[in-house]
Structure formats: structure tokens, C-alpha cells
Amino acid sequence: MNLRLPALTALGCIAALGLASVSAAAVQFPDPAESALTLTPVGTHHTGQFDESAAEIVAFHAATQRTFVVNAQSGLIDVLDASDPTAPTAIGTIAAGGTLPDGAVVNSLSVRADGLVVAAIEAPTKTDPGWLLFADAATLTVLGAVQVGIQPDMVSVSPDGRLAVSANEAEPADDYSIDPEGSISVVTLPSDLAAPAQAAVRTATFHEWEAGGTRTLPEDVRIFGPEVNTAFPISANLEPEYVTVDASSTTAYVTLQENNAVAVVDLASATVTDIWPLGFKDHGQPGQGLDPSDRDGAITIAPQPVLGVYQPDGIGAYDAGGQTYLVTANEGDAREWGDYTEDARVKDLGDDGIPPICADSPAAALTGDADLGRLNVSLADGLRADGSCYEQLYSFGGRSFSIWTTEGTLVFDSGDELERIVAQAVPEFFNSNHSESNFEGRSDDKGPEPENLAIGQIGDRTYAFIGLERVGGVVVYDITDPQHPSFVSYANNRDFAVSAEDEIDTGGDPADVLRRAGDLGPEGLAFVAAEDSPTGEPLLVTGNEVSGSTTFFAVNVAGSETPGPDPEPGPGAEPTPSVSAPTPPTPTEPATTVRRVSGELPDAGADLSPWWFAMGGVLLAAGAGGTILARRLRS
């Protein structure tokens, strides 16, 4: 198969451009000079807390020029002065203590335009009802709280500011002794800066979808695992994860991640009016492949006889051509509570009482470590009707983002593009984990693991910013035409030369290690429009749960680039080459067809190991340890 190597910018050309030598690598792919839009990290706030979820969901408030950050490690909301994005500064916190019981956990937040902060708070015992907490963005004063459903995991304020909508996930107890009901709470907000009364809370349940109810649950909505709640087993099994509200503020769309479905909520009546399954992704089709092994020593993205369960975490809504479309980040998630474990490696099927792969399955001959053997798959799906063997394998997540109609029709899926982008941008750390730098550490699980997203409008273009939780970074797509999105750029404010977990485990100071490592584990993203930004240009803010950092990116559109801070040279460091851009495709296929990024990416199914070693040799010759174009952030 013809394998085309990406062009490399010569070291001499980099020197001619005057790029200073640097010590921390901020990946910019493709070369910024060839991108219509690039993300440039300009400032970071560090907590110094490693792998403690010290920076998760973020929200920017224009009137105060403040950024609000969920810090699950401290149980507080950190408040940053973001009036100078190059030097975000902690100026205070919002605490639930004194209003809610000790041990309550902050999970999510949203800020209304007038400064009403709304935070989703989980109870100290997670199977008890939680709360929405309200505060003033200017004074940081807590205004009050109302009780909502069990384990509110995400909250969103409607575009018109009238409602707060919380996804009450209601996970089982850690030992699976209790499995409470999932629900969605709809809270009518006061028009002024005040907490609503408890009477303003309405909760949409799933009771009508139970056996004997007025609605029938579609067959492909995944209901599985121990049935602990015998009164409302479907309601207990459904786990609302993330909420988006349409532009008219009339309908909420809620991901049911483990169930691989989306719930539709009518906000006027606070009722669930529809649940539609997302179906499954055929990884056996060209352009929809995956790299399933962390033990083959090569980047091998190819079609495989596996179905992917989309299982999105984040979801966003936008309008195009007079219609509303939904965008999902297809992370994937397996259930594991108490003695129940949903996942197993393919090579372990047939052991310890687990049914084997059916002998007539195409996967039966692919159980070696270099094939499908290492891939984690679901034990809840794919069994033959008699329970004797697995006739189909289902892996977790889509390793992609998707665009859907509001009726659940798939309009676009990025196929294997995200893995191919990462393979070309950071070949020596392809599918790395977040806590440590490695090669293919996550190929056997969910690959780059797209977790969340933000949608932003710049001029007449609409962009999706998709965070990759494991390898890190943000992928940008132009989604103005929902049927024909195109890849724009990828930025990763991470230095792979710093393996954070390894250094900290051997005595490294976490604060120092994390400053050098950069951003690990992007969890929350917020787009700041130019008219709201302190710089007058768009910004993107990311909360990174593993590094505990909050980073501000300048969103540079071609012709109006915002310069970043001056680079800081490191001892003996040398500049490294950047990778040339893939040209965005000109789609000609039907809307639901998956396409590769461009002709410059290696062909689907190609073994990329010769290319990877060639690329690695060039980078190592540059003295950079395999890192790409670098720009050091000032702390």
C-alpha cells in the first residue's frame, strides 16, 4: 500500500523564521502558517495538584472578566481573574460549606450573563439527592440552594437565562447495593441575582418508560447490569450525563452515556418526550478503523471486526440552515461497581466462566496481543441468543465526534480521523495516557478518548473544539456545514518529555513537574466570543483534571493572529520541526459517509510503524526527544 510521509519543515527554515529554542512542547498541527484557525496557549493557572480533579469544568463570565473552575479536589469553585489571559490569577473561591453539608462535591457549573452562578453539587453520600447552589459572580456570595435529583453531574443555564437544567446521573453505590433513579431537573430561575425557591424545581423522570408505562424504550438503548431497583429498573439503569439546551430554550438534549442514547426533554412541561439510541459504529468499514493494540509496537489504524458503542459524554447544540444539530464527543464508558465488571479483554473471552467468541466470528482468529486480544470490549453486548458465545464484539466509545439531527439521525462521524491526526502530530506518543507519557498506552481502551467539546461562532463560521482526554489537546473542526465538517487544527499544550506520574512517583515536586508537563487530561472547555473577551479576540479555556491546570488559548483566525508570550529557552534546548498540514477534504460522499482528513494522512489500514520510526528519527536528530513545535508558557 502506498504510504505517503508528511512533509517536514527543515530546521534551517525554522531558524530563518527566528523561532527561539524552547523547553516545553506545545504541539501545533498543522503548521500555524497553513491553518485557517490555530490555538495558541497564552496563560495558565496551576493548582499544583496531580490527578486530583483540581480543575474540571470551566465557565467564563464576560461582565466580571472572571473564569469559574470546578475544583473537585478542594470541593470549591476556584475564581480566576482573567482580565489578562496571559496571567490568570486566583482571586477567591465559592464554597458550599455553611449552606450544604460537609463533604458535598462540586461537579459542574454554569454562569448566567448577569452573574448568577449555578453549581451542581453531589451529596456526601452520592446516592442521596443533590443540590443546585447559587452564587453572585461579582461578590462570590452564596445566595442559596435547592434540592434536585440524585448525583447532579452537569448543569446548564438555558440561552434565555430562565432555566437551569441538571443531569442527575444517579450512579449505583460503589458496592452496587443501591441503584437510584436517574432524572433531569428543570429549575425556573429568578430574573434577578437570587436563589430560586424549592417550588421552582421540577424533575423529569423516566417512569413512563418502565414496563407497563405509556412509552416503549427502543431496543438498542442499553439496559444492563444487576437489577437492584426492582420498582423502577429502567429509571435506575438510565444515567443522564451531560445537557445541552437548544437556542430557543424549549428543549434539552441529555446524553445517557452508559446507555448509548440521548433523552429529549420538553422544558415547558419538564417531561422526557423521547429517548433515541445512537446505534453502533462499524469499525470494519474503510475510514472507520481503529488501533486496538498497545502491544504491537506500531501505529496500525485499520478496519477491524468490532462495533463501537458511541457513548458520548459531552454534547452541544448549534443551528445551521434553520435546523438544530447536536454534536457529541464519543468518549465511551464501562460500568464497574462492586462485583460487577462490564469489560474484558478479547483474549480473555472464554476464560473464568466468560463465554468465548463464536467459532464462526471473524474475530475468532484475531485474539493475539498484536491483533484484537488486548482490546477491552463489553460483556453486556454481542452474546448469541443462547448465551453460548459472543458473535459480535463491542468496544467502548467511537474514538470520534459526531453530528446528529434532533431526531437522532447520524449526519457525520469523524471516523478514524482523530487517531490519524494524533498519529501524524505526535507519532512517538500516539494514544498516550494522560498521567504518564507513553506510546499506545490507550490503544487497547478508548484511544484518544474525546470527552467534551465547546462550540464557537467566529464570523460566519461555526467551529467545534473537541478535547482529547488521554493524549491531550484540542482538535478543531469547521462544522458550519454539518454534513461536511473539515479538520482545521490540533493544539496540545503538553510536553511529552515530562512523564508526570513517573517523576512524581520517584520524588519529584508535583508543582514543578506539572508546570513542566503542561496540560494533562482536558475535562471542560469554554469558548469566549470576541465581544466578551478581554483581548477583543476569541479565547478558548480548558480545565485539565490530571494536571490541575486551567489554560487560556488565543483563537487565531488567519489574518488576525494574536501573538503569544515570548518563549522561554531551556538549557541546551533546540528548536524542533513542525509537521506540515493535511489539506482539509472536499467532501463528495453522502452526508453519513465517514471521510479521512486528507490525502496527506496515511492510507486507512496502513501499518504506520515505518513512518513513525522515520518521523521519530528526524525529531530525535533535532534533539527534542520527539516533541513537536514548542512554545513555552510563562507561569
Question: PLM ranges: what are they?
Answer:
Residues G559-A606:
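C-terminal low-complexity, Ser/Thr- and acidic/Pro-rich disordered "stalk" regions positioned immediately N-terminal
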Residues A10-A20:
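Bacterial N-terminal signal peptides
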Residues R4, R595-R596, R634:
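Basic polycationic patches enriched in arginine
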Residues M1-A10:
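Bacterial N-terminal signal peptides that target proteins for export
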Residues P610-S635:
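C-terminal membrane-anchoring or membrane-association module
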Residues V22-Q28, P610:
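Signal peptide processing junction and immediate N-terminal pro/mature segment
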